Design a protein with these regions (language model features):
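Poly-acidic low-complexity segments
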Residues: 24, 40, 69, 83-86, ...
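Amphipathic alpha-helical segments in structured regions that serve as interaction surfaces
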Residues: 1-35, 42-56, 63
Length: 123
C-alpha cells in the first residue's frame, strides 16, 4: 500500500489524511484486479474516495456524512461537480469557499452554480 510520500499517489492525495490515501489505494488495487491497470481503475478509485471525502483546494478532507456528493454520483447521470459536496454544504458554505478561491460573481450564483465554479477553480 502506498505511503504518504509514495510517487504513485496523486499529488492531491499526498497532501490528504492517511485514511483518504488508504481508501484510494485499496480501491485502486481492487479495481486493477478487476479491470486491469489504467484509466478505468483510477476512475473507480476516485469515485470511491468521493463517497467519504471532498476535494478542498489541493487536498481531500472527510465529509460530514458519507455518500454521493452530487446528483450524477447518486443517479449515474447528469452533471458532476468534481468532488465538491453539493448535498453536504449549504449555499453559504459554498459561497465562503468560492470567496476563498476568488470566484467572481459569486454573490448572484445559485448553490449549483457555486459548486460548478468551485469545481472549475480547483482543477
Amino acid at each position: 500500500m502506498p505511503k504518504r510520500n509514495t510517487p504513485e499517489l496523486p499529488a492531491t492525495l499526498r497532501r490528504s489524511p492517511p485514511e483518504a490515501q488508504r481508501t484510494w489505494a485499496h480501491t485502486l488495487a481492487s479495481a486493477e484486479r478487476t479491470y486491469g491497470p489504467g484509466e478505468r481503475a483510477r476512475r473507480t478509485a476516485f469515485a470511491s474516495l468521493k463517497h467519504r471525502f471532498e476535494k478542498v483546494g489541493d487536498h481531500w478532507e472527510p465529509k460530514d456524512h458519507a455518500g454521493p456528493s452530487d446528483p450524477r454520483a447518486a443517479h449515474g447521470s447528469g452533471e458532476s461537480f468534481g468532488g465538491v459536496d453539493l448535498y453536504g454544504h449549504t449555499r453559504q458554505e459554498l459561497y465562503e469557499r468560492a470567496r476563498e478561491l476568488g470566484v467572481r460573481g459569486r454573490s448572484t450564483m445559485t448553490k449549483v452554480e457555486l459548486a460548478r465554479a468551485i469545481a472549475t477553480r480547483q482543477r
